[in-house]
Swiss-Prot record:
Keywords: DNA recombination, DNA-binding, Transposable element, Transposition. It holds the Pfam family rve. The gene is insI1. This is Transposase InsI for insertion sequence element IS30A. SUPFAM superfamilies: Ribonuclease H-like. Belongs to the transposase IS30 family. Required for the transposition of the insertion element. It comes from Escherichia coli (strain K12). NCBIfam families: transpos_IS30. The lineage of its organism: Bacteria, Pseudomonadati, Pseudomonadota, Gammaproteobacteria, Enterobacterales.
């Protein structure tokens, strides 16, 4: 028999999901099936919907439970109506629209009433077509809802009709009852999951590390680097694809300016040569330091420093947050190059186009200016 849920049980499902509990565990707690839990969460993308306020004239769940009890006791419709101080016609319509006297169920009837109730007001993006067009254009450029919202506030401060919160964009994407933005546009988000995950959602561990010879630890970086006060201090890492393909990613700590470098291989010789060539193409003002993890690919860091003048600092083992700017940027890059993509098929020009898109996205941490604006204000980049 199909499992039905009370409003309290539904609320607990969303709360458990928000706290990082998986489908199977939630199902065990509520005595249900994982697929049922997924279906419930899917309709709103894992976002807990606001509790609907019912009009006084509408039947409540407790009244529906009394109707069910009265029907089981073979009471007449009129007797049930008298006990509830309701009109007999109200009780009669309620029973008939919910499978009749024999099969009436209070929880099912209440859930159906909630589904059938009209939304109190139209969705913002249903009403505002110019705003919807702008939001959709930016989503297709892989801007996040937060970037879209912040950019509108910064660039169109006097146009109050072009204001929207990030959460409204998320809800319009994920709530399937809202059709202003088709839910398939979720694919443009950084993480195109069918459900939004809570902050406590589990993640897989990081890859192994090696002992770097003569490597300078990150704790010896100057305060000036840590405080992001000047350009030219970079964080870097590799992003890997199928068929042993790799690219190197570099992010300036102050401006968040991104560079993507095509690699012939992951070995230290190939990586050292590619990074050396790239850094030597930059003006000296942008060649100050590089923070990397403890991967084998930068074992020739001393040669790199001699060739470029760029000091290399290494993170602690299993500590990706120590170069969090680069980790975040790699997540953005994965929008363009999902896992199981062969990265060798892309030319340097194509990688540069992706970097250009990232560098022209407004960032909240930059007060919704773009990395390109910040770095061009500090120094003119050369080709």
């Amino acid at each position: 028999m199909r499992r039905t849920f009370t409003a309290e049980e539904k609320a607990s499902v969303f709360e458990l999901w928000k706290n990082g509990t998986g489908f199977s565990e939630i199902a065990n707690i509520l005595g249900s099936k994982p697929g049922t839990i997924f279906t419930m969460l899917r309709d709103t993308g894992g976002i807990k919907p606001h509790e609907r306020k019912r009009a006084v004239a509408h039947l409540t769940l407790s009244e529906r439970e009394e109707i069910r009890a009265g029907l089981s006791a073979k009471m007449s419709i009129r007797a049930i109506a008298t006990a509830l101080n309701r009109s007999p016609s109200t009780i009669s319509r309620e029973v008939q629209r919910n499978r009749g006297r024999r099969y009436y169920k209070a929880v099912d009837a209440n859930n159906r009433a909630n589904r059938m109730a009209k939304r109190p007001k139209p969705c913002l993006l249903d009403q505002n077509l110019p705003l919807r067009k702008l939001v959709l254009e930016k989503l297709e450029m892989k801007w996040s809802p937060e970037q879209i919202s912040g950019w509108l506030r910064r660039t169109k401060p006097r146009q109050k009709t072009l204001r929207i919160s990030p959460e409204t964009i998320y809800k319009t994407l994920y709530f399937r009852s809202r059709e202003a933005l088709h839910h398939l546009n979720i694919q443009h988000l950084r993480r195109s999951h069918s459900l939004r995950h809570g902050r406590r959602h589990t993640r897989k561990g990081e890859r192994g590390t090696i002992n770097i010879v003569n490597g300078t630890p990150i704790h010896e970086r100057s305060r000036n680097i840590d405080n992001r006060r000047s350009l030219g201090h970079w964080e870097g890492d590799l992003v890997s694809g199928t068929k042993n393909s790799h690219i190197a990613t570099l992010v300036d700590r102050k401006s968040r300016y991104t560079i993507i470098v095509r690699l012939r291989g992951k070995d230290s010789v190939s990586v050292n040569q590619a990074l050396t060539d790239k850094f030597l193409s930059l003006p000296s003002e942008l060649r100050k330091s590089l923070t990397w993890d403890r991967g084998m690919e930068l074992a020739r860091h001393l040669e790199f420093t001699v060739s470029t003048g760029v000091k290399v600092y290494f993170c602690d083992p299993q500590s990706p947050w120590q170069r969090g700017t680069n980790e975040n940027t790699n997540g953005l890059i994965r929008q363009y190059f999902p896992k199981k993509t062969c990265l060798a098929q892309y030319t340097q020009h194509e990688l540069d186009l992706v970097a250009a898109q990232l560098n022209n996205r407004p960032r909240k941490t930059l007060k919704f200016k773009t990395p390109k604006e910040i770095i061009e204000r500090g120094v003119a980049l050369t080709d």
